[in-house]
């Protein structure tokens, strides 16, 4: 419904015709962008709450920005819960409580589609081609576990292509992390036995596993195979040590322990993961709320968003009750197509102790978060004042580029906010050299600046094109690595897209010395700040993060291009010889490290051709390291 009124007047007008049933409502701003999505058991009653006199500032600001109000009737509260979750995920409204870090947790994957299964880290949906163990709360935990497993069981971690190309054992074999099945150092039966042992260990069948290993050790000893028996003995010791460190629990098997705490309108929800009785780590999530927000409301929003992405255990154990628990259970079960789930809030016993531990950890995490947030808030106030921004910046985008005389050019966007860098929002733009200097109305003084201007134009054009579909990611401030000329480019592209975002260009001073940075703004004199000011140090940190990210991705692109093209560019190296080289040495890197004499051992490679390969590849390596 579209009216010429807005805010509370619009809501009052809508209440008259609002249905008295369950459903979902959407609030839209003057540009018809969704700014809030809510659900209600009775829509009419829920909308009435928005015309009360005791609303907090955030809710009042949301209502004042509402120019359109839409609602969708549902058949049940569960259906309303599901629809609300889907719409929040789709529109990411700025006034909703959003789960910003929604990346999936890593797993350990044991492949099942190969005679010699690999043991690797995996992130994504569980597929049918493997056995999955986890989830783990962090990359550190999954990597540590994998390292321990490789030391104990020595299963391969290489790709199938790498496995098939081996003619001799790799470094993993030399450091006793792999049995080198690729070159026949272990047979299928013995390897399969190791695979079963890994499964038993990860499924916490450790007592039976250790009993079987002890029995095998005795058999090997009686057969005078002492070296093999000693290896089994070491495996038993290592398993006992790892088991002691992880601390297997009898209280829970497959469960997520969720504790919510709050302070000063900030919430922390800490999720501790337990699978097969083992702790798989914990991760905190932080939210800002309104004065009228409740634990129940924040928890409900979190649960629906969290379990759209993450694996659901058989039990969710929390420190706080929620409204309509049964509806929440049904909604999560439908989202994930599962049949078994319980949500409990224990008050005594072993589970209650686990919840209390999670609550203590959540409070510590929140304290650390708030200390960091206070420092950043002071900086944000300083930025608002320095650049005359309409409000405290919530999203800052920093841009830079990197290239080698125009080749392998990349532009990057780094994102920062009140809680630091938001690395999942970083973007890399691979740049085409064809349009670097086309269409510029600026008089260019040299080719390097021409490239920089063209690169910036490309990056901003692509960024603003995408921004049309992501209005919730509109930056409060843009910082561009560049000088006065870059101001014109930014303004030119903004005018083209009819976008008005505060921006500043930041350049190094004379002799490009750090600490003498100059800030360039539209219609203002060049500004130089004292290098010891906290705000100047913060701007340098932002600039350096973008600069380092640009260089890193430029080098990656350059290295990737060299690896793909180097062998193909050598006269006399066709597909047959290229395959022979890679098969003999096992990898492109090994070919690069080979001597001329080693190269001649490959079938079809003469002395003169080996010299040519050696010289060209080493020249490329020198370029890549420059």
From Swiss-Prot:
CDD domains according to UniProt: GIY-YIG_UvrC_Cho (cd10434)
Primary location group: cytoplasm
Gene Ontology cellular component annotations, sorted alphabetically: cytoplasm; excinuclease repair complex
SUPFAM superfamilies, sorted: C-terminal UvrC-binding domain of UvrB, GIY-YIG endonuclease, RuvA domain 2-like
Alphabetized UniProt keyword annotations: Cytoplasm, DNA damage, DNA excision, DNA repair, Excision nuclease, SOS response
GO molecular-function term, one example from the UniProt record: excinuclease ABC activity
Stored PANTHER family: UVRABC SYSTEM PROTEIN C, UVRC/OXIDOREDUCTASE
Protein's job: The UvrABC repair system catalyzes the recognition and processing of DNA lesions. UvrC both incises the 5' and 3' sides of the lesion. The N-terminal half is responsible for the 3' incision and the C-terminal half is responsible for the 5' incision.
Family: Belongs to the UvrC family.
Assembly and oligomerization: Interacts with UvrB in an incision complex.
Protein name, UniProt field: UvrABC system protein C
Organism: Rickettsia prowazekii (strain Madrid E)
């Amino acid at each position: 419904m579209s009216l010429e009124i807005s805010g509370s007047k619009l809501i009052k007008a809508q209440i008259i015709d609002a249905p008295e049933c369950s459903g979902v409502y959407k609030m839209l701003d003057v540009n018809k962008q969704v700014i809030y999505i809510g659900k209600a058991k009775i829509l009419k009653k829920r909308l009435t709450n928005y015309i009360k006199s005791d609303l907090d500032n955030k809710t009042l600001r949301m209502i004042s920005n509402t120019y359109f109000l839409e609602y969708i009737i549902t058949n049940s509260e569960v259906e309303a819960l599901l629809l609300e979750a889907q719409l929040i995920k789709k529109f990411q409204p700025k006034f909703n409580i959003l789960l910003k870090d929604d990346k999936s947790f890593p797993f350990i994957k044991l492949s099942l589609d190969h005679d010699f299964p690999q043991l690797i880290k995996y992130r994504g949906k569980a597929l049918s081609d493997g056995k999955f163990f986890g989830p783990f709360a962090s990359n550190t935990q999954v990597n540590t576990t994998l390292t321990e497993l490789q030391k104990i069981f020595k299963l391969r971690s290489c790709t199938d292509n790498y496995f098939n190309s081996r003619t001799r054992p790799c470094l993993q074999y030399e450091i006793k992390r792999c049995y080198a099945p690729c070159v026949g150092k272990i047979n299928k039966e013995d390897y399969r036995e190791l695979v079963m042992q890994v499964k038993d260990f990860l499924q916490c069948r450790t007592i039976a596993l250790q009993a079987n290993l002890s029995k095998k050790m005795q058999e090997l000893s009686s057969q005078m195979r002492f070296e093999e028996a000693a290896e089994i003995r070491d495996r038993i010791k290592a398993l006992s040590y790892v088991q002691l460190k992880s601390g297997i629990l009898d209280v829970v098997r497959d469960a997520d322990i969720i504790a919510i705490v709050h302070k000063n309108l900030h919430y922390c929800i800490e999720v501790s993961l337990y699978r097969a009785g083992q702790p798989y780590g914990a991760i905190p999530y932080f939210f800002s709320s309104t004065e009228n927000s409740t634990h129940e409301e924040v928890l409900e929003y979190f649960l629906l968003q969290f379990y759209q992405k993450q694996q659901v255990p058989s039990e969710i154990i929390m420190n706080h009750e929620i409204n309509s628990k049964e509806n929440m259970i049904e909604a999560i079960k439908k989202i994930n197509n599962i049949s078994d789930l319980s949500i409990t809030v224990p008050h005594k016993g072993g589970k209650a102790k686990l919840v209390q531990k999670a609550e203590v950890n959540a409070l510590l995490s929140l304290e650390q978060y708030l200390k960091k947030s206070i420092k950043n808030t002071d900086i944000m106030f300083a930025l608002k004042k320095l650049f005359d921004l309409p409000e405290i910046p919530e999203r800052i985008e920093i841009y830079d580029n990197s290239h080698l005389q125009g080749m392998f050019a990349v532009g990057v966007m780094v994102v920062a906010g009140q809680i630091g860098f938001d690395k999942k929002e970083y973007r890399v733009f691979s740049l085409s050299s064809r349009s670097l200097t086309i269409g510029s109305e600026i008089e260019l003084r040299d080719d390097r600046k021409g490239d920089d201007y063209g690169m910036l134009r490309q990056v901003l054009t692509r960024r603003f094109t995408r921004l049309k579909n992501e209005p919730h990611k509109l930056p409060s401030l843009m910082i561009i690595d560049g000088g006065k000329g870059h101001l014109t480019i930014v303004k030119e592209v903004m005018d083209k897209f009819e976008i008005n975002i505060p921006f500043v260009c930041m350049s190094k001073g004379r002799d490009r010395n750090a600490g003498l940075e100059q800030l360039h703004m539209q219609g203002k004199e060049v500004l130089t700040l004292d290098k010891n000011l906290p705000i100047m140090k913060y701007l340098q940190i932002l600039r350096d993060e973008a600069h380092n990210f640009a260089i890193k991705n430029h080098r990656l692109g350059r290295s990737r291009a060299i690896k793909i093209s180097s062998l193909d560019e050598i006269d006399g190296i066709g597909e047959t010889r290229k395959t022979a080289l890679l098969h003999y040495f096992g990898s492109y890197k090994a070919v690069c490290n080979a001597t001329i004499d080693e190269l001649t051992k490959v079938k079809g490679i003469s002395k003169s051709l080996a010299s040519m390969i050696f010289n060209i590849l080493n020249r490329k390596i020198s370029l890549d390291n420059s």
